[in-house]
């Protein structure tokens, strides 16, 4: 027997064909959400408050300080928040201290700071009763970046940018004359030496001393001449910069100093964030630039004064490693700026002189920023000078330019950081308000409560959750789509890219995506490559860079250890990483002398002893959905992409089955998705039924798990959980208590395992269509339950309150038979389109009645005249069984919108069997539409009499190159015959030897094909056919949701043409090309009525309707409304536009509202006309009958 048994949870054993020993379990798959939010509560929120506060008033006599905060218990439970359309949020109380600096008085007070949405254990937020997800954002990291560009003459120029988290950008660039310029915040450029002089290094000699002698520096100094001898060079530079930043304002050196300080050196205006400081220190550190260069002078330790490295030494990796411990103390130089500088502190730089790589006769000066501490959140003069040095060194062939798509330069902003940014925005708005209140009010009686207005903060948070591009309605089709949505990474959103500006490079797969972002799972269409998914082992470090785990290789012994090292993309660039599929012996050493490995994007063979790390698992490359595709390695990447995306659209079935051929990922995906119920602690089941399970812990306390039955999911499917445990079962923490939707025995089960044959049948599976046996309909194999929610609310109107009632005017008793005494539908009633769900009447304005009418009205109380029917009815195309009714009223203490007195929600469940027009798919991107459902007796059958369930077109395989489906087919049949389940993990699954040996073990023929007999004739087909078991899923694109027909419906206001689309109950567009077709046929009458009555001839269509109901000839059509619109449009351009008839007489086009009243039938009149026509018709029919009897 090939393969080995593996246990998944307590309910499933699979035969696995994997060969690689997994040394690291998958992390919790939603930790990117939960960890980030927890981090925000523990540190992020506090940090934001400390950034903005303390705040002083304008006279600096009062100061408001932040002390701490506390989150109290949420107001609603999860279930209550869902039911009441409320937020699942907790009140937050912040303690402030108000200090009076004159009297020394301190007032401390706890202030209510609004309700803060809380993340559920599943990684979601409940906002207005609906589950939402905050998608993590992929953005360019703050830091310093260098680039090169080739101009039209083929000359290479260089550029550099310092990008902060917030604040002004500082750019450097060269021009065609080899002069270096700088730009501050995208303004006009100035020679870079001008900025150096403004920083207090004004002499040419000083500049040469700092940067060394190079052509770029010389050319720039020549350009930057001293124009005004009355000013010092620094003052002149400051004025020049001020003129660029604030053109037209009077320039003084003092105002320029304060402007530059505010722009770059004030922590409130400029923030690099810890990640920006880390990236700048890493880039401007000298180690990388000095590697393999030759020293031109001795290197001295600043503290001891000893010579550490002599001139002429080549700085190899080994040499640098020897001096690593003292490297930061070597060659430190302090420069003192002059008295007119922006900042007066001394500037500490690390300065080496090396032999120029391009010309051994010259010496190049290399400057580092001497590693400022991590808490220095602004840019420093040392950073600016070191950036300029790196920029000048690039022209000398030192250093290297950055690749912006490298994942070392892109980071993730997860939920916590996105929320912190929102709170910061709110607090900054609040701070302006605070200053004014502190200055205006009396200091003696001031308390924190009086001066703090929390509105800006709560508004910022509300806006973020309600309308940000990154706050999304959770995709809840099935557990996999939930999980994928939580792990999604979007490059769009505020501060990110836009679809139109993103080019091919940003969207493309980059070598650093390996193990960090899935190269396969991304949408097709305009967002391709901009929306990605985290790889299965991906994990964020404290700076937001994605790390991936590797096994460390002991270079001394050549042993692959089980020690796990997590590396970011730029750390990985320094190493050679071997593949996880490289064979190892029993001592964990490589079997082969040469192994396949990766280094900086090159996939090549390396000597085994040169590898530093090894992948932990073959599936670390791909995301969760992709890792659920068996034989992924045999599929073309485009089809694998479709397969991964379509699994997320699977509809939960009534009785789903886990795949015979899985990948072993199904258990983990179901466990972490949040859709199942997982035991929180060890214990024993003391009560279990369909609604709740109680587990007694060892310490005696009781855990109660509530099980959801047929709840409506965000996608309108049934969210139904099934209890898995029995009374008396012992459960351990992490065990399944209940399966969620699309799960079976603790594994994800998106579809079913039908018997599939690759064969044509009467042409019905042309173009990927699917032929299906009636068994799948009768036995409810692909039946799903869908829940739709309808609501009706009563409001107060000017004419009186609306009312929910059974007494509805002009409605027969038959239509009310399923309503209760209040006028609300009974639970369990079957309803069809047009049926009343909630009877509701609205008062309507009375025409002035005569005295007699008023008297009669008062005596008999004729209600029908004063109210109109506004009942909630089942919309077009919907039907089903009423599953639940919820009633919310103010009397019960429910929170309703203002003006609403009562809200009724009706849930209708619909059981949908599979039918012609529904979309089906396999896991390999093989999708198709059901074209015919054939009676079981007519389907082809196997020699043992088993009829086939599905027939697919064999022509769908070769051109699409997704051969994985054929391998799955054969292995699936073997698994069915053997009565086992199989796991074939991606890139480490069943080989063809395993496949054929399992086929042989199952007693199948050696070619895995079989003879099929035609169900209609009993004759065998000419050729042997591939028949097997393939996992097939029913997708969310169902024909019931798409089919649509319109008779009478709404029109667009301006053009008076029917609206478009099913949601608007619109018509089918008869476009330009369709008009050409009718013209080609010469069908002039058909054409005329399509362009007039059936479109936008307003009076014509009403008269036509009237003529049809009265049985009169249809009158001539009038002028289409769109023609009037065109006339008006031309008139609005100032053109004198008239319409002439054939005798050149002007035709007057009356506007609709000017037309004669006879021409226009109002809607009310139309209803009356319909009723009258119906009555007339009934009378005529009765008369005919009477005549017949006579």
UniProtKB/Swiss-Prot annotation:
Query: Which UniProt keywords are present, listed alphabetically?
Result: DNA-directed RNA polymerase, Nucleotidyltransferase, Transcription, Transferase
GO annotation, biological process: DNA-templated transcription
What GO CC terms are in its UniProt record? Answer: DNA-directed RNA polymerase complex
GO molecular-function terms, A-Z: DNA binding; DNA-directed RNA polymerase activity; ribonucleoside binding
Record text on subunit structure and interactions: The RNAP catalytic core consists of 2 alpha, 1 beta, 1 beta' and 1 omega subunit. When a sigma factor is associated with the core the holoenzyme is formed, which can initiate transcription.
What this protein is reported to do is described as:
DNA-dependent RNA polymerase catalyzes the transcription of DNA into RNA using the four ribonucleoside triphosphates as substrates.
Q: NCBIfam families this protein is in? A: PRK00405.1, rpoB
Q: Which family does it belong to?
A: Belongs to the RNA polymerase beta chain family.
Q: What is this protein called?
A: DNA-directed RNA polymerase subunit beta
Per the UniProt record, the source organism is Streptococcus suis (strain 05ZYH33)
């Amino acid at each position: 027997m090939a393969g080995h048994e593996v246990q998944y949870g307590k309910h499933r054993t699979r035969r696995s064909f994997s060969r690689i020993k997994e040394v690291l379990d998958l992390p919790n798959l939603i930790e990117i959400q939960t960890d980030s939010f927890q981090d925000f509560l523990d540190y992020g929120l506090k940090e934001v408050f400390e950034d903005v506060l303390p705040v002083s008033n304008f006279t600096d006599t009062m100061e408001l300080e932040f002390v701490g905060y506390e989150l109290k218990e949420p107001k609603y439970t999860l279930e209550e928040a869902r039911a009441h359309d409320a937020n699942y949020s907790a009140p937050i109380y912040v303690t402030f201290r108000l200090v009076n600096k004159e009297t020394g008085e301190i007032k401390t007070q706890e202030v209510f700071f609004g309700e803060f949405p809380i993340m559920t254990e599943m990684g979601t937020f409940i906002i207005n009763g609906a589950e939402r997800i905050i998608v993590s954002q992929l953005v360019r990291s703050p830091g310093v970046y260098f680039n090169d560009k080739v101009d039209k003459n083929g000359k290479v120029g260089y550029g550099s940018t310092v990008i902060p988290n917030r604040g002004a950008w500082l750019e450097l660039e060269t021009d065609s004359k080899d002069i270096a310029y700088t730009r501050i915040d995208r303004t006009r450029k100035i020679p870079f030496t001008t900025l150096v002089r403004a920083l207090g290094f004004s002499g040419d000699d000083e500049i040469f001393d700092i940067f060394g002698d190079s052509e770029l520096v010389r050319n720039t100094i020549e350009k930057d001449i001293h124009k005004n001898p009355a000013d010092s060079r620094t003052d002149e530079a400051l004025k020049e910069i001020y003129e660029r930043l604030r053109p037209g304002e009077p320039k003084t050196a003092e105002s320029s100093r304060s402007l530059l300080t505010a722009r770059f050196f004030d922590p409130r205006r400029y923030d690099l964030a810890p990640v920006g400081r880390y990236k700048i220190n890493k880039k401007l550190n000298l180690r990388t630039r000095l590697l393999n260069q030759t020293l031109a002078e001795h290197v001295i330790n600043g503290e001891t004064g000893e010579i550490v490295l002599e001139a002429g030494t080549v700085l190899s990796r080994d040499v640098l490693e020897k001096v690593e411990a003292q490297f930061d103390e070597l060659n430190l130089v302090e420069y003192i700026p002059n008295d007119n500088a922006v900042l007066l502190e001394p500037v500490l730089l690390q300065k080496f002189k090396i032999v120029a790589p391009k010309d051994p006769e010259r010496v190049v000066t290399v400057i580092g920023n001497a590693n400022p501490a991590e808490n220095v959140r602004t840019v420093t003069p040392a950073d600016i000078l070191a950036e300029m040095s790196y920029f000048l060194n690039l022209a000398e062939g030192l250093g290297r330019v950055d690749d912006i798509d490298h994942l070392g330069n892109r980071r993730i902003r997860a939920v916590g950081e996105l929320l912190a940014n929102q709170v910061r925005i709110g607090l900054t708005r609040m701070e302006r308000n605070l200053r004014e209140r502190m200055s205006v009010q009396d200091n003696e009686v001031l308390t924190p409560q009086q001066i703090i207005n929390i509105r800006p903060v709560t508004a910022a948070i509300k806006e973020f959750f309600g309308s940000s591009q990154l706050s999304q309605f959770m995709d809840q089709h099935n557990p996999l789509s939930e999980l994928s949505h939580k792990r999604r990474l979007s490059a769009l959103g505020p501060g990110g890219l836009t679809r139109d500006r993103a080019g091919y490079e940003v969207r493309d797969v980059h070598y650093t995506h390996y193990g960090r972002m899935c190269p396969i799972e991304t949408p097709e269409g305009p967002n391709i490559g901009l929306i990605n998914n985290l790889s299965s082992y991906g994990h964020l470090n404290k700076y937001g860079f994605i790390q991936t785990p590797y096994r460390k290789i002991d270079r001394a012994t050549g042993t692959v250890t089980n020690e796990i090292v997590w590396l970011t993309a730029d750390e990985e660039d320094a190493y050679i990483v071997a593949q996880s599929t490289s064979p190892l012996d029993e001592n964990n050493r490589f079997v082969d002398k040469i192994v396949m490995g990766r280094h900086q994007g090159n996939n090549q063979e390396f000597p085994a002893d040169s590898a530093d790390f090894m992948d932990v698992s073959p599936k670390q490359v791909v995301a969760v959905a992709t890792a659920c595709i068996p034989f992924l390695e045999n599929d073309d990447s485009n089809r694998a992409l479709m397969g991964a995306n379509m699994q997320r659209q699977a509809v939960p079935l009534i009785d789903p089955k886990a795949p015979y051929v899985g990948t072993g990922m199904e258990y983990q995906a179901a466990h972490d998705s949040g859709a199942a119920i997982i035991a929180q602690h060890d214990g024993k089941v003391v009560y279990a039924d369909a609604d709740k399970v109680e587990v007694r812990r060892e310490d005696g306390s009781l855990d109660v798990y509530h099980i959801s039955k047929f709840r409506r999911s965000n996608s309108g499917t049934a969210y139904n959980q099934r209890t898995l445990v029995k009374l008396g079962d012992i459960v351990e923490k992490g065990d399944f208590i209940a399966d969620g939707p699309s799960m079976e025995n603790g594994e994800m089960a998106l579809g079913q395992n039908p018997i599939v044959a690759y064969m044509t049948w009467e042409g019905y599976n042309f173009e990927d269509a699917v032929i299906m046996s009636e068994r799948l309909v009768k036995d409810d194999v692909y039946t799903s339950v869908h829940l739709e929610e309808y609501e009706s609310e009563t409001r107060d109107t000017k004419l009186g309150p609306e009312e929910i009632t059974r007494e509805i005017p002009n409605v027969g008793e038959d239509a009310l038979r399923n309503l209760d005494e209040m006028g609300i539908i009974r639970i369990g009633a079957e309803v069809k389109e047009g049926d009343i769900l909630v009877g509701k009447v609205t008062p309507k304005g009375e025409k002035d009645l005569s005295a007699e009418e008023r008297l009669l009205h008062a005596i008999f109380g004729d209600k029908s005249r004063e109210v109109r029917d506004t009942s909630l009815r089942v919309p077009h195309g919907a039907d089903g069984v009423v599953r639940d009714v919820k009633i919310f009223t103010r009397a019960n203490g429910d929170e309703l919108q203002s003006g609403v007195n009562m809200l009724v929600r009706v849930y209708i469940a619909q059981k949908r069997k599979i039918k012609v027009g529904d979309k089906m798919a396999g896991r390999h991107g093989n999708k198709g539409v059901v074209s015919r459902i054939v009676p079981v007796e007519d389907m082809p059958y196997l020699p043992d009499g088993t009829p086939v369930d599905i027939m697919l077109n064999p022509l769908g395989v070769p051109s699409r190159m997704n051969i994985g489906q054929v391998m799955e087919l054969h292995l699936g049949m073997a698994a069915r015959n053997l009565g086992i389940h199989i796991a074939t993990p991606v890139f480490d699954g069943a080989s063809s030897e395993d496949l054929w040996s399992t086929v042989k073990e199952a007693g199948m023929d050696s070619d895995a094909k079989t003879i099929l007999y035609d169900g209609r004739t009993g004759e065998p087909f000419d050729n042997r056919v591939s028949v097997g078991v393939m996992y097939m899923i029913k997708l969310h694109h169902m024909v019931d949701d798409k089919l649509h027909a319109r008779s009478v419906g709404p029109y667009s206001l301006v053009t008076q043409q029917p609206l478009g689309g099913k949601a608007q109950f619109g018509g089918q567009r008869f476009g330009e090309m369709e008009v050409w077709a009718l013209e080609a046929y010469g069908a002039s009458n058909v054409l005329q009525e399509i362009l007039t009555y059936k479109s936008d001839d307003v009076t014509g269509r009403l008269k036509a309707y009237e003529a049809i109901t009265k049985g009169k000839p249809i009158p001539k059509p009038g002028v289409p409304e769109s023609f009037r619109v065109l006339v008006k449009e031309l008139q609005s351009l100032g053109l004198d536009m008239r319409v002439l008839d054939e005798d050149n007489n002007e035709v007057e086009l009356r506007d609709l509202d000017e037309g004669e009243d006879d021409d226009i039938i109002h809607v009310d009149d139309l209803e009356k006309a319909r009723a009258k026509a119906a009555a007339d018709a009934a009378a005529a029919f009765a008369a005919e009958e009477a005549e017949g009897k006579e």
